Each structure stands twice: as C-alpha cells, then as structure tokens.
C-alpha cells in the first residue's frame, strides 16, 4: 500500500486507468485468501481447511470472468448448498474474489483520502467518539438550534457505482462491483430496489462501502460550507474502520452577494458545528429562525440532486435547544443554559469587568424516561413498576444482568447532569420491576425475593454509584464533586433501551411530517 501511495503522489492518473489489471495479480488474492482463512479459522472446523483443498488462482480468474458475464451460478453472499464441504470450497473462492475487489478499490480511496486533507488549520477533526462530550459542553452554549439527523443507509446499487465512477476513470474495474451489488440485492430476503449499507455487517467489503458512502455524504456538506465562507477549509478523509470522528466549523462569514448561495446566509457570523457517531449526525447552529428554516429545506434538496434519490424531509429536523430535548448517543438530554458571571480585574489600571456567559447545564428528562420504561413494560404510564413478563423464561442471572445493564447505562450517562435526584426514582422503578419479574417467575412474593437476592440486585451499579456519591479524602473534595460533572467513557456501549428510544423518536418525527 505504501508503494501505491508513492506512485500515486507522483502520478495520480495511474489508479484511474490501470485498476482492472490488478484483479489478476496472484499476490493480491494470496493476501485476501489468508485474510479469509484467518477470519474463519476460529469458527469453522480445521478439517475443512486441509491441504487437499488447494487454492487455485486459475479458478479465481474464471470466477472473475463469470462475474463479467453476470453468470449467477456463483453466489457471493448467500450459501445455498447443503453440503458443507462443497459450500466451504465455493465460499472460499467467492470471499477471496470479494476481498480482492475490496483491496483494489481501497488503493485509490486511501490515496484520495490521504491527499485531500491539506489545510487542516481551518478544520479540527477528532476521530474519537468520546469527543462528543467536550462538543456538548463547549459548543451547545453557543448554539440555539440543533438537528439530530439519521444518515440514509438504503441506496440503489447503481448510485453506489456512480459514486465510485466520479473519482475512478477505469470503467472496466467497476463492472465486477456492479454485478456483486446487484447479486447481493437479488439474493436478499426482501426484494427491494435498494440495498442497505450499514457498518454493522462485519466484513471488509461492507465497511469499505460504508466509509466511502459516508465520505460522499459529508463531502457535499463540507463543499457547501466552503463555498459560503471566506476561510479555506478542506473536506475530511474517512479512513477504513475509522467511522467515528468529530468535526467543527467556525467563523463562517457572510459571503459576497454575487455568490449563488447568498440566500442561505441571513446572519453575518453563524456558528456551525458538526459531529457524527455511527449512523447519526448532529448539526448545531447559532442563527435566526429564517436561517435554520432555509437549511431545513435546502440540505435534503442538495443531497437529492447529488445522489439522485429522494431524501425524506423528516431526516433533517432542527429544533430549538432551549425548548426541546437533544439527542446524543441514543439518549435524550434536556439542556438548560445557565447564566454564569465571570469577573475580570486588572490590577495596574484598576479595571473591573463583569462578563455573563452561558453554561451547559444538562437536566435528566424524567418524564420521557418514564414514558419509555412504560413502553418497554417496566412500569405503567404513571410510573408504577410492573413485572417484565417476557423475561420470565430467562435464568435469574440473565434477568439480573439485563436490569443491571440498563441501570448502569442510564446512571453513567446522566451522571454528567448536576441534578441527579430523578435518577433515584428510575432506580426504584427498575429495582422493583426486577423483583416483581423474579417473583412472577418463581411464583413467590417480592418480600421473599428481596430477602434472598437483596444484596445481589444491581450490585455492580450500587458500588459504582457509591464511588461517585461518596468521594474520598476531604469534605472539600466532596463539595467540588457536587459542582463538577463526570462523563463515563463506557457510555457508547450498545444499549437496547437507547436504540428503542431512538426508534420511537424517529417514528414520532416521521408521523409529524406525514400529517
């Protein structure tokens, strides 16, 4: 790859004209075949990987010819043969072709990403998901509108091919990609016109498709802001398997009235901040209602013209930060801007100034959390705990672990809020719901369950809570801990309750625009 980068720096035309011959390099398929064996050796028996099944590069070349002729006798994504030995051999060659195609396409993409990030002084990029918390504390006080947008992940195969065609001039190299994408769409259970590009499929091919698709989605946003600003900023490069990044745009000035985008900017100095995690992105803007309204209708149209697909209007929805809940990492957080008085004093000239600024003050939204718990059958609509009947078939350890995981995620996330009194009500609902679930399973009473398993209920969460609520050393440290917020680094873990919450909110927004 380093050798390709050096050649690409000297002459960038080679990857647009000579990609297709790389498909017939035996070294490429030797590497891809080794990667496939390494990934499947832990889950498949070793006798299937014996030396009797020799890997033939001639067979690989014939498979490539079948793809060119769109011969659907080979299946790259669905294994239909009941014979495991024949199926294993077929899958080995098919996956090697798929790995080889991915390796070839990664060469120009990595070069394009590497040499397109010049002038990063105007753009500050942080590729860690934990940078979202400094983003919330630093940028939300300077914003008044926030948009929580879900990136469209259902797209037609031909549009994906056209995104590659914009920066790869070698048309024959895209024929195998087109055939593979159409075959994957036809082999899926739901025969739709679109395919789903999500990073949850843990294969090199789908990770590459997702990174390239996100790169294209965000490059149009970057180019729009570049045209609307005097300052020079370049688009970001999303490298493979680096899907979490944080990007900030600042100091956007009003462009010339002769610019075609002058109708977008009705404020001289709008602050625009952007962050993405997984399939969702947050855009924070400080501007007038007219500016936000224009963004609301302009961004879907701009993306529609770029990707040639209809983008639902509810995917871009701005709401006022001071009146609504803000979504982050699947959870919802109510934000209150608290005025903070800062006094400055200059001793020499005896000058005293009082500065008033906004401070990020997150609040735990108790009512939405109770509404979500009632939807998930942990309590009724008034917040009275009930038993989780769907979990009574599980073991006691599984029930305790599931309740413990939900409480730990909620407590760790909202521990960054100053007022955590509402969390104790949530803890009461979950603990009593857990006790009722165990009592319903064993056909006993809550008193018996608490007597037998009382210390074990949320044992890990209680210990973590005591570490936060009872700081060591001195009373001064205890007082300081009450003024400071603590964001835990294990918040981004998978939480089914948070995903369910996000789906409910997306459905509400969709129904709102359908009316």
UniProtKB/Swiss-Prot annotation:
InterPro entries hit by this protein: Domain_X, Maturase_MatK, Maturase_MatK_N
Main localization of the protein described in the UniProt heading: plastid
Any Gene Ontology biological process: tRNA processing
Keyword tags: Chloroplast, mRNA processing, Plastid, RNA-binding, tRNA processing
GO molecular function: RNA binding
Cellular location(s): Plastid, Chloroplast
Gene Ontology annotations for the cellular component aspect, listed alphabetically: chloroplast
Pfam families xrefs: Intron_maturas2, MatK_N
Family: Belongs to the intron maturase 2 family. MatK subfamily.
Xref: HAMAP family: MatK
Function: Usually encoded in the trnK tRNA gene intron. Probably assists in splicing its own and other chloroplast group II introns.
Protein name in the entry: Maturase K
